[in-house]
Amino acid sequence: MSRAWAVSKRELRAYFTTPIGYIVLGLYALVTGLGFTAQFLFYAVMSESPINYDFPAVPNFEETFLSPFLTYCGLIFMFIVPMLTMRLFAEERNLGTIELLFTHPLRDRDIVFGKFGAGFILILAMIALLIVEILLIYRYTQVEAAVLALGLVAVSLMGAAFLSAGLFISVLCRNQTTAAVSTFGVFFLFFIIGYFGGELPEENPAPAGWPADYRALAGVVYTVFRTVATKLPIEAHAKELAEGILQPADLLSYVLFSAFFLFLTFRAIEARRWRA
């Protein structure tokens, strides 16, 4: 792990000897700050006249403010993470230093976990800024510390999931621009799938006039497709976590998503070594 930490320190040094680290932190603080202000003002308006918004009483703070806000903060990583991961491997290839990295006495796991760790440390720094924003109103609310902690864990897991996918895409690209655009494109595709997946009806859309066997098969295929469309998006499992509802399946989905793309990153590096 000491070698992985050495890689992480190298990457962190690169982030903060160039403007990218400061830009990312500043941009995240700005965008989450604007979202925090807008969501809190909207909650205040709803609390003053809940009947106008179909609430019988003052709306629940966790459901109407905390959960949407934390999910929003996690989704911002869809735009931020490509800026972090675009340089992790793509810049190495562009500068010609990736061969030096691979010939250095480092194992693949040292390289992958080191680069992933550097990106995740930056994500944790962004979440620290987020905590400062939440603490401004925490004392005036009745949010339990455990609920808030679980919501922040959800944001962290979203960041890790985005980061692992971006790391894999960076391995495949030759320059930073291609890596950033490709990463955002994949993230946006996940988001669109989830957006339209939530609108899909639950019932079998196959025409009633179809033969029973075909209709049954179409129903199975549609059910699988709808399940994937609603569960695949990275933000799909964060909403309940941000409300303090702990479901092991939600945590496991993020762990498996991140592990899957880290595994693909290992395989991509291994394939590159064989080609070399």
Language model regions located:
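Aromatic- and glycine-rich beta-strand/loop motifs that create alpha-glucan
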Residues: 1-25
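Hydrophobic alpha-helical transmembrane segments of multi-pass membrane transport/permease proteins
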Residues: 19-45, 75-80, 185-189, 260
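Secretory targeting signals
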Residues: 32-37, 56-70, 113-178, 246
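Terminal transmembrane helical anchor/hairpin motif
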Residues: 39-63, 179, 185-276
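Long, hydrophobic alpha-helical segments
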Residues: 65-91, 126
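Hydrophobic/aromatic residues in alpha-helical transmembrane segments
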Residues: 81-85, 133, 164-165, 264-265
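Transmembrane helix boundary and interhelical loop/hinge segments in multi-pass membrane proteins
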Residues: 82-102, 116
